Amino acid sequence: MFVKTGDKVRVIAGKDKGKEGTITKTVAGKDRVVVEGVNIVKKHQKPSNEYPQGGVIDIEAPIHVSNVQLLDPSTNEPTKVAFKIEDGKKVRVSKKSGNVLG
């Protein structure tokens, strides 16, 4: 997967198209990511220790990784990601600016 937890991304497709946020969780087996403040859905929660009241709560649901594009940290513009081998390690590189991504 070309994105990691903590990356800033922009949603490029779907109901939240154009929104930006930080990736809070990745679901690798299904190629999905949870982006902060994006794809908010209502969930009917049974009472539990965490939610003693229960009821309807808003949560961030995962979206497919193909619907997000990484933002280049130096220019804050959407960019594609390339992979290079540097000093024997595989690193992510921004195709737009050529900078190594954290």
Curated annotation (Swiss-Prot):
Keyword set includes Ribosomal protein: yes
GO CC terms of this entry: ribonucleoprotein complex; ribosome
Family annotation (CDD domains): KOW_RPL26
UniProt-listed Gene3D superfamilies: 2.30.30.30
BP GO terms, sorted: translation
Signal peptide: none
Keyword presence, Ribosomal protein: yes
One Gene Ontology term of the molecular function aspect: structural constituent of ribosome
Cited InterPro entries: KOW, Rib_uL2_dom2, Ribosomal_uL24, Ribosomal_uL24_CS, Ribosomal_uL24_KOW, Translation_prot_SH3-like_sf
Keywords, sorted A to Z: Ribonucleoprotein, Ribosomal protein, RNA-binding, rRNA-binding
Subunit structure: Part of the 50S ribosomal subunit.
Record's function text: One of two assembly initiator proteins, it binds directly to the 5'-end of the 23S rRNA, where it nucleates assembly of the 50S subunit. One of the proteins that surrounds the polypeptide exit tunnel on the outside of the subunit.
Record family assignment: Belongs to the universal ribosomal protein uL24 family.
HAMAP family in the cross-refs: Ribosomal_uL24_B (MF_01326_B)
Name of the protein in its database record: Large ribosomal subunit protein uL24
Gene assigned in the entry: rplX
